[in-house]
Amino acid sequence: MRLDKYLKVSRIIKRRTVAKNLLDRGLFLINGKVAKPSSEVEVGDVVELSLGRHKITIKVKELAPYVKKEESINLYVVLSDEIIEVIYDEIS
């Protein structure tokens, strides 16, 4: 399944066009490699998302063309969810 579609179906990203725009900016990795919207995702793949200061790592558990909102959480497992702290140097 295409990554942009998977992100929409799993409701990690609410709209496929938004997923495509983020993927075009190189903010996602599949198994450590930069992903494109058309990159294929398979069960067992590890997907890393960098959204602002938020970094989320998930593992794909299941692929489905459509699932109900309540069942979308079953498509992946969150491996890590962290906020990256930004440290600013003081200007004298």
PLM feature segments, named:
Residues 12-13:
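Loop/turn elements at beta-strand to alpha-helix junctions within RNA-recognition modules
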Residues 2-5, 17-21, 27-92:
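Strongly charged
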